Amino acid sequence: MQRMRGKIFKNEPLVPMNVTSEHEQVQSISKEESRSLSSNDLNLSADSELQLESEPEIESEQLKNHEDVYEIIRSMVLATDTTLPRLSNNSLTGIYNHWKLNPNDDLPLYNPTKYIPYEFHSQYNQDRSYIITPRLSVTKLLVSSWCELRSFYQVYSGSVRLPSTKAMTQGTKLHSKLEAEIHPEIDTTEIEQFLISNAMSLRELQTTVPAEEETVVIDLGEVEQLAVDWAEMLIERLFSLIMGAEAREILLHGYLNLKNRSFVTNKDEIRESSSVLVSGIVDYIKFQNVTNPSDGTLFDDIHGFVDSAFDQVDNVPLVDLSQFLPEAKQILQNYDFRLTFTDVKTRSARQIPRQESVLEAAKFQTFYYRHFFHLLSRDSRFTYFSLIENAERRGHDVDKPLSILTTISLLRKHYHIFFKDFVKLANGEPIGFSPFDDSAKSIPYDFVSMFQSSDEFSLANPNHNHFLEQISAIDGIEYDSILSPLLKVWKTPPTLRYLAARASQLFNVFNENIGDITSVEYRYNKTSELLSEKVYDYNFSEFQAEVESASKFWNGEREVIPTEDLSRCSYCEFQSKCMVAGGKTTEAVEKKTIGPKIRQFLNECESSSKG
């Protein structure tokens, strides 16, 4: 605490502040504080004033020093009462509020708070999911793509979401179009509506069932959404990669140890507090003979095995994953096929980026995906526990039974993968993966009562004939073959734990087939025309250097590096208050940085004294 000219200025630690709207951006300063900061309050002695009048050169120098002191003090003091100009956008409002800055001042180049970027990102974020589940994305690690200073300011603004643009919307549509070409969506809306309506009718008849024994029929919560994502963007996609040589939109993740500046490679490290969950979605993976891309003999062997080993329903083989996984891995080892990893960038004009840093960031994005896939394919046990940790960090119970609606939806869309496994779960049989088989909980799962029509409903003697006729009439699938054998009380319910087990085994199939070729496709978002493809050779040393740099940024262990290309500033939401964008001199920048540095020091001192 310091006393200055009869006014007490107390350095206060940073406290959470909400990002206000543009109509709430007026800040103020009291008349007393305004006077205390005026040049008349620098407390010059009478002798000094006489000397200044007789010695112009000394006067000039001292006034300059006083102005410097004034600037430093002013940059430390927060405005309170006098009306100040509004900030031009919510991002600026956020960072000025969080950093307690005077809106008349430029943004400092130095973080004046006690929070490192990752801590701040995990506590002050407009997207509350990052507060509930602290994590980073692959794109968040690419801090040097445009301007590190902008990335830095975005974090401390509270990660304010920028409005979606027309180009972004078109890009999203193109990604969905490319995904549907390989993974056509099966619309189960009508089936789900029928099941919900039927369940509502039956619920009125089930007044004798104790609440604690009820199996959840309808649940559209986050656990269910994650289950669908794992089933479709992991299990189905990896199976498609084995059977059809390509897949799009595959979920990947890793755990970045910010202290060691490297990704975790053993399951014991996963739960450490310094291990940060990093998630990403790889746009496209191709599985091919790199020296002869037209070679399809591996897939002929895979399909030959599947067609001969498994029964079919509607000309679709019902694959037993317990048998398929070890056999597929053995077949893959007989061929020199490799995975290649591609990121798709959409462009609103028929040209690729000219900025080298943007091109480099895109390259490293593919390196991250390649590295994640490598980590997830090395050891199925590591991947299994990695997925379990992923779900638990999101607050999910991995042993919670999935709702009936989710289970029947997954069965309808992907019965070729899940039917045989669901039979095993229903009968309480092992699936052949010991980490799951040894820990799966035996919980009664009522997969029978809800699959009746109200006109023939019975708890004691369920009759499914009319129900099966009704649901088969919706889309013509042989439900009598894929549903009837499952209509019982299951001994082991379907859970996130089960999905983690199968996903980890599918990753491991590719253990010896990870390639080093990555690429970035640039496509015109209006037509999907391929404008250019940049091909890269994965280099671990180069990648690790990038990981270390990103780790130091998020750990607050290095200074941020502003862009040298000031033409980029015109696209930045912080331009109007950025000293770099304003072309300020080094001396001016340093002077305006001293105050925030002092504020940071005082914050740290006060925090230490309280701790």
UniProtKB/Swiss-Prot annotation:
EC id: 3.1.-.-
Source organism per UniProt: Candida albicans (strain WO-1)
Residues engaged in binding [4Fe-4S] cluster: C147, C569, C572, C578
Location in or out of the cell: Mitochondrion
UniProt entry tagged with the keyword Hydrolase: yes
Full protein name: Exonuclease V, mitochondrial
Main location class: mitochondrion
UniProt-listed InterPro entries: EXOV (IPR019190)
Keywords for this protein: 4Fe-4S, DNA-binding, Exonuclease, Hydrolase, Iron, Iron-sulfur, Magnesium, Metal-binding, Mitochondrion, Nuclease, Transit peptide
GO molecular function: 4 iron, 4 sulfur cluster binding; DNA binding; metal ion binding; single-stranded DNA 5'-3' DNA exonuclease activity
Biological processes annotated in GO: interstrand cross-link repair
Renumbered residue ranges of the record's region Disordered: 19-42
Cofactor list: Mg(2+); [4Fe-4S] cluster
Subunit structure comment from the entry: Monomer.
GO cellular component: mitochondrion; nucleus
Family: Belongs to the EXO5 family.
Bias kind Basic and acidic residues: ranges: 21-35
The keyword S-adenosyl-L-methionine is assigned to this record: no
Function (record text): Single strand DNA specific 5'exonuclease involved in mitochondrial DNA replication and recombination. Releases dinucleotides as main products of catalysis. Has the capacity to slide across 5'double-stranded DNA or 5'RNA sequences and resumes cutting two nucleotides downstream of the double-stranded-to-single-stranded junction or RNA-to-DNA junction, respectively.
Cofactor note: Binds 1 [4Fe-4S] cluster.
